[in-house]
């Protein structure tokens, strides 16, 4: 099973309706291509922008095809792959695309979270490498 975890910056602020449409289309695509995963959206009040954090998992061919689609989508930019690799089993097997719209209260409960791009984030990257994206996503999946 192949997986890819990435972050990106939304090209615009996503309303609940925008997110619902995005999820509906993503779930249709994912079901048709055997993709499962989790999508996290967060609007940052300080920077007045939204960010996505997503894990997709499936066969290597399905991930490559889906990644081409994701990376050319004009609804976001500045895509950064945090991690990719192989796993023995699906991590989000029941979700064609799980979703969380995260606010400040949720993030306060995530161990080791620092705002993407903040001074604290880059200090942690310098000291420890990239944060453990899998455990962060698992925290959202488990219902932080």
Residue ranges of each PLM-predicted region?
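Charge-rich, low-complexity N-terminal segments
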Residues: 1-144
């Amino acid at each position: 099973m192949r997986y890819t975890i990435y972050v990106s910056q939304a090209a615009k602020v996503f309303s609940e309706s925008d997110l619902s449409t995005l999820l509906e289309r993503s779930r249709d695509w994912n079901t048709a291509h055997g993709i499962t995963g989790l999508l996290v959206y967060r609007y940052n009040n300080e920077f007045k922008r939204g960010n996505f954090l997503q894990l997709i998992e499936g066969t290597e061919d399905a991930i490559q095809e889906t990644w081409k689609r994701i990376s050319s989508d004009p609804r976001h930019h500045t895509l950064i792959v945090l991690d990719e690799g192989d796993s023995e089993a699906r991590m989000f097997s029941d979700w064609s695309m799980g979703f969380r719209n995260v606010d400040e209260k949720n993030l306060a409960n995530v161990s080791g979270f620092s705002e993407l791009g903040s001074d604290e984030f880059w200090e942690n990257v310098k000291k420890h490498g990239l944060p453990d994206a899998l455990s962060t996503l698992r925290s959202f999946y488990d219902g932080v």
